[in-house]
């Protein structure tokens, strides 16, 4: 879970996409919170805010889950919620990438950056943590039956 928190936090600070302008100009970079235009200006985009909120809540829930190690059922339910939020982030990103949800601040062809893969990596890490917590819960139940 700690790796999932770190990966989510890194995803907040690195660009998730780039937009090559249709005419002449430099590429604009898309972050989870907004767009850095080719001229160096920062535009907080209403289109990108859901990406920021989803990834931030995912990181916070993953961090909270670490400290709930004594309550495995709550841990598993928070892991499920975290995975749902990460899937929602991926869907929102794909909709932006395909142009179904346009970014009004810049126009052009959108490309994928490396940081767009980080929430997917985090999703895999949370799924692995969920499996580990579930296995621990089964082990504890089996030990209780033996007594």
Where are the predicted features?
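Alpha-helical transmembrane segments of multi-pass integral membrane proteins
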Residues: 90-147
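Juxtamembrane helix-break-helix junctions at the cytosolic face
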Residues: 63-76
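N-terminal signal-anchor transmembrane alpha helix
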Residues: 1-18
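Alpha-helical transmembrane segments and their helix-start/interface "positive-inside/aromatic belt" motifs
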Residues: 1-5, 73-80
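Perimembrane loop-to-helix junctions flanking transmembrane segments
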Residues: 23-43
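Transmembrane alpha-helical segments of multi-pass membrane proteins
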Residues: 77-91
């Amino acid at each position: 879970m700690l790796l999932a928190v770190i990966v989510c936090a890194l995803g907040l600070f690195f660009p998730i996409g780039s937009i090559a302008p249709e005419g002449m100009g430099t590429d604009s970079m898309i972050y989870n919170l907004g767009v850095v235009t080719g001229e160096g200006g920062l535009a907080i985009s209403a289109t990108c805010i859901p990406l920021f909120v989803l990834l931030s809540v995912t990181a916070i829930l993953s961090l909270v889950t670490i400290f709930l190690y004594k309550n495995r059922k709550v841990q598993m339910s928070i892991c499920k919620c975290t995975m749902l939020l990460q899937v929602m982030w991926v869907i929102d990103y794909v909709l932006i990438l395909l142009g179904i949800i346009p970014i009004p601040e810049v126009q052009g062809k959108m490309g994928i950056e490396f940081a767009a893969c980080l929430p997917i990596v985090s999703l895999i890490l949370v799924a692995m943590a969920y499996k580990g917590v579930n296995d621990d819960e089964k082990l504890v139940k089996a030990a209780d039956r033996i007594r």
